[in-house]
Amino acid sequence: MILTMGCRERTRGALGIPGERPAGVFTAGVAQAYINLYNVMPAKEVVILGSGDIGMIMARRLTLEGAHVQAVFEIQPYPSGLPRNVEQCLNDYGIPLYLSHTVTAVHGDNRLTGVTVSRVDEHLRPVPGTEKEYKCDT
């Protein structure tokens, strides 16, 4: 899972993501460093939390580098990035964008094995019964 939550990177606790932080949960900056500086792909199966421009650009970049980006999830009912990035980074690559959704659980002991995503209501609270699990290593 790659956390792309705005221009200032925040900790998992500050983002309200429950559970532990096993290996495989990266901020956008760390994921970019792996790819750009170390020429290392951080994962094969990816879930991205946050639809800002960096999140969408990372979705495209990871896809171009050979990863499978399952989806980009945004807690707000609208994308937080530019419309052109929704088109050029997600739609052009067949990457789904789920608005009003957020990660409600992180799975894995030593390494991330998946996340649970839930739809949220107008108060940004998870809606019971909407949970869906996604297998991912990042």
Regions found by a protein language model. Name each.
Residues 16-17, 22-25, 41, 46-47, ...:
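Alpha-helix boundary/interfacial micro-motifs
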